[in-house]
């Protein structure tokens, strides 16, 4: 095995000609948004068009770039091919046309309430319909904390179960609905209409599911910090991703403290972190592990993000500390 086969950068992702979907995720507070912004910035250098999507209800993209984003792709200031959007994968935000079925006499909201999670599945399908129609070269997802992300990635199987339950309901109650429809002059609930909408949603999800499980098209980048809970959750996340057949070959370790003269607290924390860095090295010896430093200022604004993003492709050298434009001496 060559020494540089698992180089400590994300060059393998940046240089991939086929990757379409890139997920960035991990425990809350580890720097997922900063990392996803940095990944998108590096991709914008080599791709025709890049879309960065936040599925985290906290929506930190606007804060990171210092620019307001909405649920429609917006060009990031300072770029010509990088777009960003912030979405909430909930039925209230993403699937109004599904809820309009109520005007035909069918209250879909009540129906989806009977099948836990299917409303989220339909909403996610609507997001993917939109994203696919826009035809960006690559899409980067800034995801919510681990549990929420795994739910989204598990949606295809959830939707299959929901549709099977719906079809069973249709078979069992079609006679009742038809009778009600006759009494109301044909304005009662249309199960056929409902089935068409769900089947359309299922088709999109199935197509996306195939792509998500294709390592040439999709990869996941876990972000962690060298502390017990973060390392533990990262390992659990990677195990779950493996069960879902989703590729993961990169790990980003953020907020690393390096030794400093006359800083006993820094040195004590660095010593504590070393134990977990050693664990990460043992666990992910066959991964691209990128190490990022804890900085003295927040990484906010395009100039700082551009500078920080370089650390994803050029390993950090603590002998030449990174100084951000907004950093005070």
UniProtKB/Swiss-Prot annotation:
It comes from the Eukaryota. GO terms for cellular component: GET complex; phagocytic vesicle. GO terms for molecular function: ATP binding; ATP hydrolysis activity; metal ion binding. InterPro entries: Anion-transp_ATPase-like_dom, ATPase_ArsA/GET3, ATPase_ArsA/GET3_euk, P-loop_NTPase. Keywords: ATP-binding, Cytoplasm, Endoplasmic reticulum, Hydrolase, Metal-binding, Nucleotide-binding, Transport, Zinc. Pfam families: ArsA_ATPase. Its EC number is 3.6.-.-. Zn(2+) binds at residues 263, 266. GO terms for biological process: tail-anchored membrane protein insertion into ER membrane. Transmembrane segments: none annotated. It is found in: Cytoplasm; Endoplasmic reticulum. ATP binds at residues 27-34, 227, 254. The active site is at 56. The keyword Manganese does not apply. Belongs to the arsA ATPase family. Homodimer. NCBIfam families: GET3_arsA_TRC40. PANTHER family: ARSENICAL PUMP-DRIVING ATPASE ARSENITE-TRANSLOCATING ATPASE, ATPASE GET3. ATPase required for the post-translational delivery of tail-anchored (TA) proteins to the endoplasmic reticulum. Recognizes and selectively binds the transmembrane domain of TA proteins in the cytosol. This complex then targets to the endoplasmic reticulum by membrane-bound receptors, where the tail-anchored protein is released for insertion. This process is regulated by ATP binding and hydrolysis. ATP binding drives the homodimer towards the closed dimer state, facilitating recognition of newly synthesized TA membrane proteins. ATP hydrolysis is required for insertion. This is ATPase ASNA1 homolog. It comes from Dictyostelium discoideum.
């Amino acid at each position: 095995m060559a020494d540089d086969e698992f180089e400590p950068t994300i060059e393998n992702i940046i240089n991939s000609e086929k990757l379409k979907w890139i997920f960035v995720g991990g425990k809350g507070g580890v720097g997922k948004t900063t990392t996803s912004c940095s990944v998108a910035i590096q991709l914008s250098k080599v791709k025709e068009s890049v879309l960065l999507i936040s599925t985290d209800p906290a929506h930190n993209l606007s804060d990171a770039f210092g620019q307001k984003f909405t649920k429609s792709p917006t060009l990031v200031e300072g770029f010509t091919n990088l777009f960003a959007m912030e979405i909430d994968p909930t039925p209230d935000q993403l699937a109004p046309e599904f809820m309009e079925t109520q005007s035909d006499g069918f209250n879909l909201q009540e129906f989806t309430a009977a099948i836990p999670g299917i409303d989220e599945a339909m909403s996610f399908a609507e997001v993917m319909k939109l994203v696919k129609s826009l035809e960006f070269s690559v899409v980067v997802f800034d995801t919510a904390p681990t549990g929420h992300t795994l739910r989204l990635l598990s949606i295809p199987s959830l939707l299959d179960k929901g549709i099977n339950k719906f079809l069973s309901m249709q078979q069992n109650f079609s006679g009742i609905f038809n009778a009600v429809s006759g009494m109301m002059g044909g304005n009662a609930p249309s199960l056929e209409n409902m089935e068409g909408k769900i089947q359309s949603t299922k088709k999109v999800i199935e197509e996306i599911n195939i792509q998500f499980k294709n390592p040439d098209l999709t990869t996941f980048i876990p972000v962690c910090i060298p502390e017990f809970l973060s390392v533990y959750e990262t390992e659990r996340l990677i195990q779950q991703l493996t069960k879902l057949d989703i590729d993961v070959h990169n790990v980003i370790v953020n907020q690393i403290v390096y030794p400093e003269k006359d800083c006993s607290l820094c040195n004590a924390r660095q010593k504590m972190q070393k134990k977990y860095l050693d664990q990460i090295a043992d666990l992910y010896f066959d991964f691209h592990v990128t190490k990022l430093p804890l900085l003295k200022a927040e990484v906010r604004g395009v100039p700082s993000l551009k500078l920080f993003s370089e650390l994803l492709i050029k390993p950090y050298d603590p002998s030449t500390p990174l100084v951000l434009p907004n950093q005070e001496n």
